[in-house]
Amino acid sequence: MAEKGITAPKGFVASATTAGIKASGNPDMALVVNQGPEFSAAAVFTRNRVFAAPVKVSRENVADGQIRAVLYNAGNANACNGLQGEKDARESVSHLAQNLGLEDSDIGVCSTGLIGELLPMDKLNAGIDQLTAEGALGDNGAAAAKAIMTTDTVDKETVVFADGWTVGGMGKGVGMMAPSLATMLVCLTTDASVTQEMAQIALANATAVTFDTLDIDGSTSTNDTVFLLASGASGITPTQDELNDAVYAACSDIAAKLQADAEGVTKRVAVTVVGTTNNEQAINAARTVARDNLFKCAMFGSDPNWGRVLAAVGMADADMEPEKISVFFNGQAVCLDSTGAPGAREVDLSGADIDVRIDLGTSGEGQATVRTTDLSFSYVEINSAYSS
């Protein structure tokens, strides 16, 4: 049993292979299988109204609360491919179901990569045969985590040990990240014995305060998907609060890894807003700052430019006292009552982690934190050549 990742909990096996979908020749397909005895499943998906074919198929299949296997491919998003894209997604599901002796409705499917290119179905189906070949499925969570990478530089795994039961997970995604998950595919597994309702509550609560508050570049993917699969193999049923805590811890860890590996990242930035009417307004204000390119450029340059913070937050749909706003960088006041504080320009932001705190001055109880990164030369270079 693995020390971390999707095969750390009891009842799960995985496989990975190189099907030739990625131009790099790196591994590009993975499979996660729940061996039971239970098969509860929960999921959350992108809120982008232009969503990929695998999202449509997975939404349909998880609707009954059970998923027994999830198929992943990297290098091709199978998004914006019309009816052919949906046909291909369903064909891959049927092929896998037949190989595993399952129903089509037991299968989740996830794709990531370039938008607008048809899947090479000959390679995909051959890859499915490799993933399900005799001896392929086993304690291969680490290999699966590597196979789903696209522009990621490192694989992302996690594990949370509870009282006799475990939550494991893997994720990918470094760009096109904005609330509504973040361009990412995440698979969480647990050997706890839980109902679909318990799993969905835990997953929805966790993603709302982890992945949904990760905003790298303001772009929301067509393919975002997070699955939580429960095998019940531990024989232990946690309370809802215990499950919530473990799933949150797993999501938080993966979200931190996504932020740390964001495309071109040199700074990991947390933007916290307080002093507005409610949490919804606070998160709107934090996102407004986190998405502001001038602010992000200042972070790249280690420049404590509080004026850019004020200019950005002033555009937010949040209650504020425009003449009473305060800004703190790494705990040091740089702006008080919307005016520069002594020593503001001397604040040292040369470290990799920057904490920005903004008080909107209303004395309201709203507060929220959004995690983002700087805007570097490397980010532009990576994304200017993504389809070439």
UniProtKB/Swiss-Prot annotation:
HAMAP family: ArgJ
InterPro entries registered for this protein in UniProt: Arg_biosynth_ArgJ, ArgJ-like_dom_sf, ArgJ_beta_C
Similarity field: Belongs to the ArgJ family.
One Pfam family, short name: ArgJ
Coiled-coil parts of chain: none
Key words, A-Z: Acyltransferase, Amino-acid biosynthesis, Arginine biosynthesis, Autocatalytic cleavage, Cytoplasm, Multifunctional enzyme, Transferase
SUPFAM superfamilies on file: DmpA/ArgJ-like (SSF56266)
Catalytic activity: N(2)-acetyl-L-ornithine + L-glutamate = N-acetyl-L-glutamate + L-ornithine; L-glutamate + acetyl-CoA = N-acetyl-L-glutamate + CoA + H(+)
Role: Catalyzes two activities which are involved in the cyclic version of arginine biosynthesis: the synthesis of N-acetylglutamate from glutamate and acetyl-CoA as the acetyl donor, and of ornithine by transacetylation between N(2)-acetylornithine and glutamate.
Site (Cleavage): 182-183
GO cellular component terms attached to this protein's record: cytoplasm
Subunit structure: Heterotetramer of two alpha and two beta chains.
UniProt-recorded name of the protein: Arginine biosynthesis bifunctional protein ArgJ
Superkingdom, natural source: Bacteria
Keyword Transferase assigned: yes
Site residues, Involved in the stabilization of negative charge on the oxyanion by the formation of the oxyanion hole: 112-113
Enzyme class name: transferase
NCBIfam families found in the cross-reference section: ArgJ, PRK05388.1
Organism: Corynebacterium glutamicum (strain ATCC 13032 / DSM 20300 / JCM 1318 / BCRC 11384 / CCUG 27702 / LMG 3730 / NBRC 12168 / NCIMB 10025 / NRRL B-2784 / 534)
Active-site positions on this chain: 183 (nucleophile)
Lineage, top ranks: Bacteria, Bacillati, Actinomycetota, Actinomycetes, Mycobacteriales
Gene giving rise to this polypeptide: argJ
